[in-house]
A protein has these predicted regions:
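Domain-length cofactor-binding catalytic modules of enzymes
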Residues: 2-29, 37-43, 50-56, 64-68, ...
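Iron-sulfur (Fe-S) cluster-binding segments and ferredoxin-like electron-carrier domains
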Residues: 82
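Glycine-rich loop/turn
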Residues: 34
Length: 256
């Protein structure tokens, strides 16, 4: 397969192989974005592809600036995995459909307010709470085919005898509202992390992260109750890294 780590230029790394085709526009966006002020390092994942001015599937490291436009509108987009009590040997499509019902169940306005009383922009997006969204977002039942490290599978509570429920979703309209607000105020320029604007963005960003995570819980909740699920793992896309002192934090690039 060849070397999977390539460095086409200083400060840029591609995680790929010679056999993997990458879109030229995505690589162009990667190089252009890497020249933005305060970006000291850029890394592209194997699934890199063109986005709205910035590549999707890449990570960028900064030390002083935050780029809301680079992070994108689907703040907190990620995947959570639960193991259900549904047995793999007893799979029946009709029965599963009846047991699981509708995976997209919006919450009422009062439920949203009680869950997130401090997130003001959310009041405009109550209709999206508890829903999956579009694009490549999904909720699906999965089955383990091969376990490569049994100790890790046991540690996070996964086995081949039960079905797993995976939910891929983000912050829905909330993340877009946060991004739109900052684009109207500051355009695509970077924000100094310790400035009032930077702190304001980080507060809203972290609220959207918490909302996105709990929204995946809400999507799975009806099926958690019915199937006695236990959440095994959560993974979040994390493409801009900002470091201050010894405490780095991570944020994602753009909605898929």
């Amino acid at each position: 397969m060849g070397n999977s780590i390539q460095q086409p230029s200083a400060g840029i790394t591609l995680i790929t192989t010679p056999e993997l085709w990458l879109e030229g526009e995505a690589i162009k966006q990667l190089h252009t974005t890497a020249t933005l002020p305060d970006i000291s390092y850029a890394a592209a994942m194997p699934d890199i592809h063109p986005g709205r001015g910035y590549p999707v599937g890449a990570a960028f490291f900064t030390t002083q600036l935050i780029y809301p436009a680079l992070i994108g509108g689907d703040i907190g987009c990620g995947m959570s995995l639960w193991q259900t009590s549904l047995k793999t040997h007893a799979m029946n499509q009709a029965k599963l459909i009846k047991q699981l019902g509708n995976l997209d169940q919006p919450l009422s306005a009062s439920e949203c307010t009680s869950l997130w009383p401090d997130i003001q922009p959310l009041q405009q997006h109550n209709y999206a709470s508890g829903t999956i969204g579009g694009g490549n977002h999904f909720a699906e039942l999965q089955m383990l085919d091969t376990i490569y490290v049994a100790e890790i599978a046991e540690q996070i509570g996964l086995n081949k005898q039960h079905l797993q429920l995976m939910v891929h979703s983000g912050s829905r309209g909330l993340g877009s509202a946060i991004l739109d607000k900052h684009i109207r105020q500051f355009g695509h320029q970077g924000l100094i992390a310790d400035s009032e604007a930077g702190k304001s963005y980080l507060t809203q960003h972290n609220q959207a992260l918490a909302y996105a995570r709990q929204n995946r819980e809400l999507i799975a909740r009806p099926h958690t109750d019915k199937s006695a699920c236990t959440r095994a793992k959560t993974s979040r896309h994390q493409p801009q890294l900002y470091r201050s002192g010894l405490h780095p934090w991570r944020k994602r690039l753009a909605a898929p």
